[in-house]
């Protein structure tokens, strides 16, 4: 959740309030009844809701809920000004707080300043996607080919590969990277 407050309750007894910068990770598994209600009195409610398809063998697992406050999400700050919030997976040896996920995802919130470059290894067998929600950049897969210019509100999907490269021009870019 980038801005606002959201209350979660579900039939398994889980409850929590998600605040700006926090993450809620829920596994529906064999099924769960839940509600999410905005709690802010005024202002912006801005965030993302993503669904991960479980492997067939895990679709009937018990429901699970994890509320991660913003302060529990580590931020990798590189010397070149790149900031990476690590929700799940690992970057520069820093693990994200969301663990024990059967799909083993990489889930990052990446901010790259103007005139910078970013490279991220993507595990073989994983498809990667980048949703750009601020700014613009050139996204490529490290194959020597020219990248593709992608701007805010656009989604890029990358096939199985080892490397994602992002270059910024006069404006920076912020995006979710999920693999």
Task: List PLM regions with ranges.
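Ligand-binding loop in jelly-roll beta-barrel domains
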Residues: 13, 29-58, 149-152, 159-179
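A short, N-terminal "cap"/entry segment at the start of jelly-roll beta-barrel domains
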Residues: 37-44, 54-104
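Generic beta-strand structural signal
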Residues: 16, 22-24, 34, 44-48, ...
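Short, conserved beta-strand element in jelly-roll/cupin
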Residues: 1-6, 51-56, 107-113, 125-139
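Short acidic (Asp/Glu) patches
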Residues: 4-14, 20, 27-40, 66-71
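Structural beta-strand/beta-sheet cores of well-ordered domains, especially the beta-sheet scaffolds
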Residues: 46-48, 82, 106-108, 116-118, ...
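Short acidic-glycine-tyrosine-enriched beta hairpin
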Residues: 9-27, 122-124, 128-131, 136-169
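Conserved short histidine dyad/triad with adjacent acidic residue
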Residues: 2-10, 28-30, 90-96, 106-123
